[in-house]
Each structure stands twice: as structure tokens, then as C-alpha cells.
């Protein structure tokens, strides 16, 4: 069996680079360019949630929803990596 606790992983601000972020966005359900930019500024560039939302004209509530979706995508990828070990 695979470790189910991977579903509780959470993205941490400044702990990913642009390529990692882009790959997660590619397989996530998030499509809004403004939200993607706000998420990138928050997770990769280190802006606060408030700053990222203001700079990209995104509501904080929708930003948080998108962050939750991206966290879910990240947790699924974390669980899947178990099946791709050599």
C-alpha cells in the first residue's frame, strides 16, 4: 500500500521554483491567468497573499480557493510518486 498521509501535504511559500509551479499549474484545474500569476507571486516570489491579490486584481476568497485546488493537485502528485519509484 502507498502512504496515504501524502494527501495532507501542503505547498509552502518560497519552497518551489518556477518550473515546479508551472508543472503543477499545467495539471491543475486552474486556468485564470490572473489567479495563476497571483499564486506564482505568492508561492514562488514570496509576496503575501494580500499583495499578490492586489497586484493581480484577484479577490482573496477566490485566491484561497485556487490555492486549495493547487494544494490538492500537489497532494495527488505526492501520492502518485510512490508508483513511479524504480
Locations of regions flagged by a protein language model:
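Short, amphipathic alpha-helical "recognition" segments used to contact nucleic acids or chromatin
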Residues: 32-47
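Short, Lys/Arg-enriched anionic-surface-contact patches
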Residues: 12-34
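General nucleic-acid-binding
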Residues: 1-11
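Short Lys/Arg-enriched helix C-cap and helix-to-coil transition segments
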Residues: 73-86
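Short alpha-helical "recognition helix" segments of helix-turn-helix
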Residues: 51-59
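DNA major-groove recognition helix of helix-turn-helix
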Residues: 66-67, 74
Amino acid at each position: 500500500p502507498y502512504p496515504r498521509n501524502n494527501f495532507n501535504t501542503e505547498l509552502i511559500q518560497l519552497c518551489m521554483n518556477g518550473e515546479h509551479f508551472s508543472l503543477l499549474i499545467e495539471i491543475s484545474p486552474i486556468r485564470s491567468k490572473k489567479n495563476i500569476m497571483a499564486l506564482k507571486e505568492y508561492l514562488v516570489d514570496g509576496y503575501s497573499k494580500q499583495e499578490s491579490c492586489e497586484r493581480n486584481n484577484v479577490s482573496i476568497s477566490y485566491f484561497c480557493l485556487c490555492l486549495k485546488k493547487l494544494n490538492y493537485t500537489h497532494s495527488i502528485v505526492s501520492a502518485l510518486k510512490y508508483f513511479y519509484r524504480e
